Amino acid sequence: MTNIRKTHPLVKIINNSLVDLPAPSSLSAWWNFGSLLGVCLAVQILTGLFLAMHYTSDTATAFNSVTHICRDVNYGWLIRYLHANGASMFFICLYLHVGRGMYYGSYTYSETWNVGIILLFAVMATAFMGYVLPWGQMSFWGATVITNLLSAIPYIGTDLVQWIWGGFSVDKATLTRFFAFHFLLPFIVTALVMVHLLFLHETGSNNPTGIPSDSDMIPFHPYYTIKDMLGFLIMLAALSTLVLFSPDLLGDPDNYIPANPLNTPPHIKPEWYFLFAYAILRSIPNKLGGVLALVLSILILAIIPLLHTSKQRSMMFRPLSQCLFWLLVAVLFTLTWIGGQPVEYPFIIIGQTASVLYFLIILVFMPLTSLIENHLMKW
C-alpha cells in the first residue's frame, strides 16, 4: 500500500516541507523564529478577521466601533488586544529573525534573503496602516506625518501625497483605503511567505557553524516539530501575559483620545517597533535626506550579501565581528529609545551619533573587520 503522505499531490507538498524535510542537526533556538512568525501571522489574520466583522471604516464611527468591540462584543477586548499586542510580538520575532540571519550569514542565500526584505517592508506597511484604523489622536497625526514625508519626493511629491490621501488632508477617503489595504496585505504577505519557503527549501537551512551540513541531517519531524511547539508555547504565554495583565503597556495613551485635526499631540511618535527608523528620519535636518535615510535604514539589508568579505560564513568563530554585531544591536536599542524622546538637547545629538554609527558599522566597520579576521587567520 502506498503512503498517502508521499503520493497525494497536496499532502506531498506539506510532507516535504514539514515532515520528511532534511534539516541540519545543530540548529539552535535562533532557528525557531521562522515558525513563530508563521504563528504570529495566523493569529493576526484570525483576530483581524473577527475585528473586521465589527469595525467601520468611517471617520464618524471608527473610534466608536473600536470602543463597541471592547465593551459590547463577546471577548471583543481580548480579540482587539491580541491583535494589537500580536503585532508587537510579530516585530520582536521579525527583528530577531533578521538578526539571526545577519549573525549566522544566512543572507548568502540571496533569493531567500531578498524575499525576506520585501516581506519586512510589507509587514511594516501593514502595521502602519493598522495603527491608523482606531482613529485616535496618534492614529490621525501619525498618518498625517508619515504620509506627508512623500511630499519630499521632487516634482511629484505633493500630487502623490494628495493621491494617497484622496483629498487635501487625511480624512474619510484615507481611512477607508487604509482599511482596504490593511485587510488585503496580510494575504499578500502569506503568499510571499510561501515564496520565501520555496527558495529556502531549494538550498536547505543554514546552521550555526555556517559549514555545509549535508552529511549530518535529521528529519524535521519529530525533532524540530517538537522544538517549534515549545517555542509556540513560550511565545503564546508571553503574549497572553501581556494581553491579560498590561494590554496598553506598548500603546500610546493619546490614541484613547478621538482624532482631532485642530489639536496636535505634544509628541507625535509611531509604535515602538518603528522608533529606530523614526529616530534616523529625525536625525537629519533636511526633509528629503531624512526620508532617504529612513528608507535606506531598512533597504541597507539588501546590500549586506555584497559586503560579506569574510572567508567564513557564520560569526560563530569570529570574535571581532561578534563585538561589532552586538555594538550594532546596542545602537539599535539607543535609536529606539531616542525615537520616543522629544526633539531637544541632548537627544538630538545622541540620535545623530547613533544614526551615523548604524550606517558606519554595516557599511564600513563590518567588512573591514572581516578582512582583518581573514588576515589574522592567514587566509
UniProtKB/Swiss-Prot annotation:
* Major subcellular site: mitochondrion
- What's a Pfam family in this record? Cytochrom_B_C
Annotated a ubiquinone binding lies at 201
Membrane topology of the entry: Multi-pass membrane protein
**Cellular component per GO?**
mitochondrial inner membrane; respiratory chain complex III
* Gene Ontology MF term list: metal ion binding; ubiquinol-cytochrome-c reductase activity
List positions binding heme b b566. Answer: 97, 196
Residues that coordinate or bind heme b b562: 83, 182
Source superkingdom: Eukaryota
Matching entries from InterPro entries are given as:
Cyt_b/b6_C, Cyt_b/b6_C_sf, Cyt_b/b6_N, Cytb/b6-like_sf, Cytochrome_b, Cytochrome_b_C_euk/bac, Cytochrome_b_N_euk/bac, Di-haem_cyt_TM
Indicate the transmembrane segments per the record. 33-53, 77-98, 113-133, 178-198, 226-246, 288-308, 320-340, 347-367
Which cofactors must be present for this protein to function?
heme b
What more does the record tell us? Answer: Heme 1 (or BL or b562) is low-potential and absorbs at about 562 nm, and heme 2 (or BH or b566) is high-potential and absorbs at about 566 nm.
The entry assigns this protein to a family as follows: Belongs to the cytochrome b family.
User: What role is this protein assigned?
Assistant: Component of the ubiquinol-cytochrome c reductase complex (complex III or cytochrome b-c1 complex) that is part of the mitochondrial respiratory chain. The b-c1 complex mediates electron transfer from ubiquinol to cytochrome c. Contributes to the generation of a proton gradient across the mitochondrial membrane that is then used for ATP synthesis.
**What is the official name of this protein in its record?**
Cytochrome b
Q: Which organism is it from?
A: Rhinophylla alethina
Q: Which gene encodes it?
A: MT-CYB
